[in-house]
């Protein structure tokens, strides 16, 4: 092929009925490929999908080389962190504006390469996402920040500011985030 690729395979789960397992793995593989391609169409950097093997539930996609945003944020100074966080907020806004919820929005599922942020692993994502799913995305990202980046929580405010600037319905989603957080406190 001449290109460096990643193979992402969904392995069979022995505890599931084989027919159900095969169907679920293929459906989830196709869904992830669609979301990656749709996100790219919206202007969010994602890996190029080269092939979808529905027999083995495998994606063949572009390898994105670079540090995870999780690692980059910890190793960067304030100026670089601000640049990265502003881009993260803008890209999340683009995804949400296009109706896509990532489903596992953490700094571990973002890679810094070619001076930009790439989003990976849309396996838990959804298209035509409801307000709740968009809120869960931001809630997960905030939790990831509190867990992995508690010493730079002010950087999360940059993400939210950029998100507000790139997504007209940001205020609604942020209200939903507050509601989700409040539910978590009382359960």
Describe the role of every protein-language-model region.
Residues 37-44, 70-108, 113, 138, ...:
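Conserved kinase catalytic-core helix
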Residues 118-187:
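C-lobe/activation-segment region of protein kinase-like
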């Amino acid at each position: 092929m001449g290109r460096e690729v990643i193979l992402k395979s969904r392995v069979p789960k022995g505890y599931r009925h084989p027919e159900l397992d095969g169907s679920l793995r293929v459906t989830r593989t196709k869904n992830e490929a669609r979301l990656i391609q749709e996100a790219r169409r919206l202007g969010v950097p994602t890996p190029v999908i080269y092939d979808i093997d529905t027999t083995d539930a495998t994606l063949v996609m572009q390898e994105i080389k670079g540090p995870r945003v999780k690692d980059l944020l910890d190793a960067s100074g304030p100026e670089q962190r601000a640049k990265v966080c502003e881009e993260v907020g803008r890209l999340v806004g683009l995804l949400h504006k296009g109706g896509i919820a990532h489903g596992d929005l953490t700094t571990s599922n973002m890679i810094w390469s070619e001076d930009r942020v790439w989003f990976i692993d849309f396996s838990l994502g959804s298209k035509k996402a409801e307000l709740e799913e968009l809120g869960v995305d931001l809630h997960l990202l905030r939790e990831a920040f509190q867990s992995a980046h508690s010493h730079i929580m002010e950087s999360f405010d940059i993400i939210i500011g950029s998100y507000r600037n790139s997504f007209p319905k940001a205020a609604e989603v942020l209200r939903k985030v507050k509601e989700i957080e409040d539910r978590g406190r009382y359960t």
